[in-house]
From Swiss-Prot:
Protein name from the UniProt record: Serine--tRNA ligase
Pfam family, one: tRNA-synt_2b
Binding site for L-serine: T241, A242, E243, E295, S404
Pathway(s) per entry: Aminoacyl-tRNA biosynthesis; selenocysteinyl-tRNA(Sec) biosynthesis; L-seryl-tRNA(Sec) from L-serine and tRNA(Sec): step 1/1
Amino acid sequence: MLSRQFVRENPEVVREALDNKGVDVDLDRILDVDEEWRELKSRGDDLRHERNEVSSTIGELKQAGEEEAAQEAIERSQEVKSELQEIEERADELEAELEESLLELPQIPHESVPVGADESENVERRREGFDDLREVPDNVEPHYDLGEELEILDFERGAKVAGGGFYVAKGDGARLEHALIQFMLDVHREQDYRDVFPPIAVNSTSMRGTGQLPKFTEDAYRIEGTNEDAYDDDDLWLLPTAEVPVTNLHRDEILLGEDLPLKYQAYTPNFRQEAGEHGTETRGIVRVHQFNKVEMVNFVRPEESHERFEGLVDEAEEVLRRLELPYRILEMCTGDLGFTQAKKYDLEVWAPADDMDEGPAEGGRWLEVSSVSNFEEFQARRAGIRYREEHHESAEFLHTLNGSGLAVPRIVVAILEYYQNDDGTVTVPEALRPYMGGTEVIEGHDAVGETKLGGE
């Protein structure tokens, strides 16, 4: 959330951010409301001063026997009271409108962010792991076909149980997801992260604090009512990311300098209504309604946030390095930068099966497995999260950052395709074997029930 003062003093900076991020907000209306509100507050201060002066003279006039003048003062006091009430009511209305309007303004991109219209103008910063690729089959089978053949992914039963966009991981597929979650948590514990296991349901106030509401209502799962209905502060939603509950742990709190940097990690299932929109994303587990993810959230001093941002990128990368998966780092341009972010990098892993136009020369495609973001004070201001170095010092807003560490299903996709063998089995990455009871190769399972009879 941008402060009123910043918007008031930097309207052209805000206007440029709206253009660069493609956000349609009536900034002129916000500025007009702010100006009228300030004029009313000034008029209200004048009236309160006059009321106090008039009130102090009434007794003096009565004591002096000037009844007519005293009566005039009483009448003026009542007029001031009535006018002041009208002004305060109007000022409260404008302030409420202003607060809601400020929630619609996006974060200002950091000056280092490349300017661009859309994702085609994102900037690739580097690639890792392509100098020593393992040999993959000439025709890598897509994860969605291989997963069904090995009986470790079940899309039909996922749809039967919950509807389209859901899947079931079973057998070694389920073990692989569990292994990845525990492995990721262990890696980040080594990086001094503190574990959090938050509620899966979050209230509207929490969603607003991190910026999911009011802008992204249509993508969220609401527990009661429809997304089109008005919502109250305590209405519940299924969390779209652990960023929401973990950031809001310290909503309306003041941390101490000695607490910072404060680094949390949380595993949660995540729920989003954005499943499969086009192309190969309509198949498999690349884009689904429910998925597992480990999230890292940092609370830091403002002057340290951009250095910590680079550290957070490295902490997410460490998972990919240990899994020995090829990947690249992409910096988002202004047009592809999220509503809340000042700066963002995506970590994209290589999945070699499905060739896509924007994929690498080796074939296949890129899959985003982590977005690492610096929100600066944007979320902290919305959620009221401050810090002070010493007890006697004034509190100021801190900076928040987060990053996926990582999104589990897409790592499963990368493993099933990159570690695929000619015989249709999948080699388990060495780093994961201790988490899978020493299993080195996923060979699959027999089908159960009449489905294994095929067409018979």
